[in-house]
Amino acid sequence: MAKRGKKYVEAAKLVERATAYSATEAVELVKKTNTAKFDATVEAAFRLGVDPKKADQQIRGAVVLPHGTGKVQRVLVFAKGEKAKEAEAAGADFVGDADYINKIQQGWFDFDVVVATPDMMGEVGKLGRVLGPKGLMPNPKTGTVTFDVTKAVNEIKAGKVEYRVDKAGNIHVPIGKVSFEDAKLVENFKTIADTLLKAKPAAAKGTYMKNVTVTSTMGPGVRVDVSTLV
């Protein structure tokens, strides 16, 4: 296990590991225990009672956080003709087709989110091996394969985040920055919790939201009382 720095150790002493704090208390603690000198990201982690190996217990989607994440997302849109013009008008950072496919194949990745119109997916599909492992492949479930490119770009720029359960049943989602007001972090936190509760698979048995923690980039994790999120 990696050795923790002195600042981290001191910060961790402020957190009672056996205690599940209210969402508001947890956010306050995360800000108090942040040791980074930069505006650290605040991330929520949900351990869910699902079996991701089963197709009917996969959880994946996207949600627009009311106060965004504090990160400016660079959006690449694969589209042609009028749809390309709409994407540019909506504020997409990069818009094109074959030219950007070639750039990516040559190692260009100066973007954070990829959107594609359905008619472009035949070409974009060639990038599956490159974009897939990075979590950048457009997908209808997250609203990134669509003809409504204006809505897609607007939502991403407004603070849309994608979520996907991993092999261990966990979901990690950024909910803002330590510079955010407490109330805004809590509202973002509750928004993603509510979204995940609504996404509960019918086949999931037992306790669904088993454990929730919140942490800053370089700070200790803080357990959260699930009942304060709903």
Curated annotation (Swiss-Prot):
UniProt record, GO biological process: regulation of translation; translation
Gene Ontology MF: a single term: structural constituent of ribosome
Keyword Electron transport: no
Pfam families per UniProt: Ribosomal_L1
SUPFAM superfamilies on file: Ribosomal protein L1
CDD domains in alphabetical order: Ribosomal_L1 (cd00403)
PROSITE patterns recorded: RIBOSOMAL_L1 (PS01199)
Cellular component, GO annotation: large ribosomal subunit
Gene3D superfamilies registered for this protein in UniProt: 3.30.190.20, 3.40.50.790
Keyword list, A-Z: Repressor, Ribonucleoprotein, Ribosomal protein, RNA-binding, rRNA-binding, Translation regulation, tRNA-binding
Oligomeric and partner information: Part of the 50S ribosomal subunit.
Stated role: Binds directly to 23S rRNA. The L1 stalk is quite mobile in the ribosome, and is involved in E site tRNA release.
Family, similarity comment: Belongs to the universal ribosomal protein uL1 family.
Protein name (Swiss-Prot/TrEMBL): Large ribosomal subunit protein uL1
